[in-house]
Design a protein with these regions (language model features):
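Glycine-rich beta-strand-to-loop/alpha-helix junction loops that act as flexible
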Residues: 47-52
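Structured mid-to-C-terminal alpha-helical surface segments
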Residues: 1-45, 56-63, 68, 72-263
Length: 263
């Protein structure tokens, strides 16, 4: 889809070890500019999740992230937004699937990598259509991409860093992915953060999904049950930027002390 020379050019902006990752990374960057350059999309959706953390707050990216997670800002019909997303992402071709339900809409584009070995790539866009709220307020964040294949800029609608990390803390409890632990660890060790705000946001988002939010003791028990699980610990290492040193045990001790024991 993207000529080899543009992928080679983009390598100067990334440290990913294989060409397919470099190509997919460039696709993500263009998709973000295309989406948030559109007035309807920018009014309707906010950028959240791991890709938001690493693309707009924690540059250079410490780990690879391949999905775009969005949240519908207000409760309104989503179909006009889906139609506009399709229009803005025409450059990805026609191999597109859409799954809709009351809480989420998932769009997946599929394409083949340009540089051999040819592999199947995808861009998944997931829209949360249930959490029409924020805790610390939305913000506009300047974002730009420069490449001979595509150059452009926009203002991405997203959240305060502490709010993104509050939702990440919720994800750490809810699923078995070591990348959630890594993201929290990397943010705390590389940014001056308001821990109380992170915990406050976590509680607000957890209160939204469960009647009885887990206590600190319950969260710690949850983590003890998976911190040595190969599924959890093995999730992150293939995603790390070359040269990034990381140990799950060290990360857990830091997150346990700074966050979990303060819930």
């Amino acid at each position: 889809m993207i000529s080899r020379r543009y992928i080679e050019e983009w390598k100067a902006n990334t440290s990913w070890p294989n060409d397919a990752q470099v190509e997919q990374d460039l696709v993500i960057e263009r998709a973000l500019v295309e989406l948030f350059s559109d007035n309807l999309i920018r009014k309707s959706l906010a950028f959240r999740g791991g890709t938001a953390l690493h693309k707009i707050f924690m540059k250079p990216q410490a780990r690879y992230s391949e999905d775009i997670d969005l949240v519908q800002i207000t409760a309104e019909p989503i179909n006009p937004v889906l139609k506009q997303i399709r229009e803005k992402l025409k450059f990805l071709g026609t191999k597109r699937s859409v799954k809709q339900n009351g809480n989420n809409n998932t769009i997946v584009y599929r394409f083949e990598s340009e540089i051999p070995p040819i592999i199947n790539l995808r861009l998944k866009i997931e829209i949360n259509c249930r959490e029409h709220f924020n805790v610390l307020g939305l913000k506009e964040i300047p974002f730009a991409v420069e490449n001979s294949w595509f150059s452009g800029s926009c203002n991405i609608i997203s959240y305060e860093l502490e709010e993104l990390l509050g939702t990440k803390l919720r994800a750490l409890y809810q699923r078995r992915k070591g990348r959630d632990l890594f993201d929290l660890y990397w943010a705390i060790t590389n940014h001056n953060l308001d821990i109380e705000k992170i915990i406050h946001c976590y509680k607000e988002y957890m209160n939204f999904v469960v009647k009885q939010p887990p206590t600190s003791k319950m969260f710690l028990a949850n983590m003890e049950g998976k911190i040595y699980d190969p599924e959890f610990t093995g999730d992150i290492y293939s995603l790390l930027r070359p040269g990034v040193k990381y140990e799950n045990d060290i990360a857990y001790d830091l997150i346990k002390t700074n966050l979990l024991e303060k819930i």
